[in-house]
């Protein structure tokens, strides 16, 4: 009897150890990985030894395991698992975060959000062909835009001395140049009386 009792105790201890190991691998992939892996409750999620979280899911009918990627947090990995589970198992999928079903962004864009080129617009999308102003408001919109743009322009332009330009123009026509403050108007009398031969060349185009 004494030799049988130790064997029974050893068999019982081995069964208990195997039970603990089997239970540690249910749900979240526990039993290995980073320090927070043991406390993870998300299905298909585990932590690497360097702290990153990974997610994977098995195909229906005990198929192959699909790798879903590496994530910074366990929640991100759980959301990735839920997204894949909805595609593989449909509405019957067991989700980690069912309350986040609506808030989680869709991986594929919906048909309504896609813009298709129109034959009437020469391949341009509808967003490109739309104008910020309607046809009846185009003129008012342009005026408002011009007023706003000129209102915010504050440039200190330099003051130009254009006296030399006017002097050169009058000399080319044969007129005397009168400087500011010059009260001698005798030269204008000469111009009026026909003293300058170029006066006839200065005529109206009409």
From Swiss-Prot:
DNA-binding stretch(es), residue numbering of this chain: 41-98
Expression induction: By high-salt stress.
Residue ranges, compositional bias (Low complexity): 107-139
Covalent S-S links between cysteines: none
Subcellular location: Nucleus
MF terms (GO), sorted A to Z: DNA-binding transcription factor activity; transcription cis-regulatory region binding
Region named Disordered: 13-40, 102-139
Entry-linked SUPFAM superfamilies: DNA-binding domain (SSF54171)
Coiled coil: none
Any one GO cellular component localisation term in the record: nucleus
Pfam families assigned: AP2
Keywords assigned: Activator, DNA-binding, Nucleus, Stress response, Transcription, Transcription regulation
CDD domains registered for this protein in UniProt: AP2
Family, similarity comment: Belongs to the AP2/ERF transcription factor family. ERF subfamily.
Function: Putative transcriptional activator that binds specifically to the DNA sequence 5'-[AG]CCGAC-3'. Binding to the C-repeat/DRE element mediates high salinity-inducible transcription.
Name of the protein this chain belongs to: Dehydration-responsive element-binding protein 2D
Organism, as annotated: Arabidopsis thaliana (Mouse-ear cress)
Gene name per UniProt: DREB2D
